[in-house]
């Protein structure tokens, strides 16, 4: 008979980085008695969640997708951002068979090439350099009509920073002698991931039919008009630039976001014949390309196929007869399931999942606690009943409220997290369980931008905390990275790590 599991809980505080600076630091400004006590009494340190340590370009801030891939894989995962950038640099991008086939088909029929994606240098969902390369590819393949549908950022970049990006694309089209910006809209509409189809329909109708509340002669003019309406980049309303550039049958549409979670919904509207979440006025039959595979179930080709990861933590636990729970609210559910499992949609044997709906508010500063208390209720219940060997939870608050740029809300968010962590650690103490507390990347520790004085709404490259909660005589070694977390969990579970995991336990004997 097997012993009753005493769970090992991995608590991922999304967007919860470490900074010594008090300026705009919601964590240091908050009252967090539980975390303060854990830092004083439990083995803890800092680990890296950015740049080359997570498979991103040197100096690039981490993000939730990348962070969870590394956390679950137990090895540094070469990221799509890096793959695409390298392909452009090596020239392979311009021969990519999937993109070239779609463009050539459109060009051969005298049709247009539509390039859409997040236009910024944020590097989280996309990079403007990739959109420049796509425009160059279209011209090289003979396209005469090239239209850019620009989604504006202001979330992974400063709130009002899109002008330079729009000017870059204008300069690119001028240099190439072809192409223009056709529409601009904030990512709030085009890149929803919470089934808010009213937002997505606004973006779809703008791109497909040039249906827009506002018109402007240039992207920059449209942006300045939005600022005059007090709309930051993220929230810029549907704006048509110049003459209508509708999407017609036979056109090529290339979505240049490399990150999947905020590209799925708009993609589904374009390509799913049985799409029912809102009524499309038209569904043009286009040659659609996803830059990467946004979901296996989406009926469209991807330019960069997903690489498979063998023996990620979830798979290895399942193969060794261990049970696991994955739990998060809507905003981060994909991260604690799909991304943590190395890009796999289906649960592993013995893996259960709980999705708690995120609150239906326009922005999460209006409800900084989000659904964290409800998530915690489920975890405490699972711990008390000792249902699982391993529980993996994501708390979205630090990241989602951090993105609002509103300090007071961010303080409330992290104070709520402190209460939740306290409830989990108290429940674990009763049953003899253990926990690891960490984060996927920074955000909420920097709510103001020192250089501009604007709200800081983006992620950071700061290290993230790593705390062991338990009774073993252990200490945290120096130099840990996110890829070391899964091997650390296996170490605590008394399991050998698989050879595919190149990370090393962060915990060593005292």
From Swiss-Prot:
What cofactor does this one take? Answer: Mn(2+)
What is the name of the gene encoding this protein? gpmI
Which EC class is the enzyme in? isomerase
Q: In which pathway does it act?
A: Carbohydrate degradation; glycolysis; pyruvate from D-glyceraldehyde 3-phosphate: step 3/5
Q: Where does substrate bind?
A: 125, 155-156, 187, 193, 259-262, 332
- Protein name as it appears in the record: 2,3-bisphosphoglycerate-independent phosphoglycerate mutase
User: Binding residues for Mn(2+) 1, per the UniProt record?
Assistant: 399, 403, 459
Q: Which GO terms describe its biological process?
A: glucose catabolic process; glycolytic process
The subunit field of the Swiss-Prot or TrEMBL record says:
Monomer.
The record's listing under InterPro entries reads: Alkaline_phosphatase_core_sf, BPG-indep_PGM_N, Metalloenzyme, PGAM_B_sf, Pgm_bpd_ind
| Keywords of this entry | Glycolysis, Isomerase, Manganese, Metal-binding
Q: Where does Mn(2+) 2 bind?
A: 14, 64, 440-441
Gene Ontology molecular-function annotations: manganese ion binding; phosphoglycerate mutase activity
Family membership noted in the UniProt record: Belongs to the BPG-independent phosphoglycerate mutase family.
């Amino acid at each position: 008979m097997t012993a009753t599991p005493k769970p090992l809980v991995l608590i991922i505080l999304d967007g919860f980085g470490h900074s010594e600076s008090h300026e705009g630091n919601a964590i240091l400004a908050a009252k967090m008695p539980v975390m303060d006590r854990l830092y004083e009494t439990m083995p803890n340190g800092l680990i890296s969640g950015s740049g080359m340590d997570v498979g991103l370009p040197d100096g690039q801030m981490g993000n939730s997708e990348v962070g969870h891939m590394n956390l679950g894989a137990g090895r540094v995962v070469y990221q799509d951002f890096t793959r695409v950038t390298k392909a452009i640099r090596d020239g392979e991008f311009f021969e990519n068979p999937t993109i070239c086939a779609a463009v050539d088909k459109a060009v051969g029929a005298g049709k247009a090439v539509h390039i859409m994606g997040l236009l910024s240098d944020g590097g989280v969902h996309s990079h403007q350099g990739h959109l420049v390369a796509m425009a160059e590819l279209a011209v090289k393949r003979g396209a005469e009509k090239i239209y850019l549908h620009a989604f504006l950022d202001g979330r992974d970049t400063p709130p009002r920073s899109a002008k330079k990006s729009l000017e870059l694309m204008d300069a690119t089209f001028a240099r190439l002698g072809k192409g223009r910006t056709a529409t601009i809209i904030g990512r709030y509409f085009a890149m929803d991931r919470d089934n808010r189809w009213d937002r997505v329909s606004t973006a779809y109708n703008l791109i497909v039919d040039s249906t827009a509340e506002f018109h402007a002669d240039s992207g920059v003019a449209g942006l300045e008009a939005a600022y005059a309406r007090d709309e930051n980049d993220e929230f810029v309303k549907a704006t048509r630039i110049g003459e209508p550039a509708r999407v017609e049958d036979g056109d090529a549409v290339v979505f240049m976001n490399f990150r999947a979670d905020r590209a799925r919904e708009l993609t589904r509207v374009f390509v799913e014949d049985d799409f029912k979440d809102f009524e499309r006025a038209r569904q043009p039959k286009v040659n659609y390309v996803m830059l990467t595979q946004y979901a296996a179930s989406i009926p469209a080709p991807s330019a960069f196929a997903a690489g498979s990861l063998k023996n990620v933590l979830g798979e290895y636990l399942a193969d060794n007869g261990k049970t696991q729970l994955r739990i998060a609210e809507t905003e981060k559910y994909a991260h604690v399931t799909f991304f943590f499992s190395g890009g796999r949609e289906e649960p592993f044997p013995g893996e259960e999942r709980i999705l708690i709906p995120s609150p239906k508010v326009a922005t999460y500063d209006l409800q900084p606690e989000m659904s964290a208390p409800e998530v915690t209720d489920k975890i405490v219940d699972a711990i008390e009943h000792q249902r699982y060997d391993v529980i993996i939870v994501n708390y979205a608050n630090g990241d989602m409220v951090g993105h609002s740029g509103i300090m007071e809300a961010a303080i409330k968010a992290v104070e709520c997290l402190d209460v939740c962590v306290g409830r989990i650690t108290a429940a674990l103490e009763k049953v003899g369980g253990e926990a690891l507390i960490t984060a996927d990347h920074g955000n909420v520790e920097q709510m103001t931008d020192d250089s501009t004085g604007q709200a800081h709404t983006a992620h950071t490259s700061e290290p993230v905390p790593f705390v062991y909660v338990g009774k073993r005589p252990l200490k945290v070694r120096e130099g840990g990275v996110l890829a070391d977390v899964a091997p650390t969990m296996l170490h605590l579970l008394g399991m050998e790590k698989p050879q595919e995991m190149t990370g090393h336990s962060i915990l060593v004997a005292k």
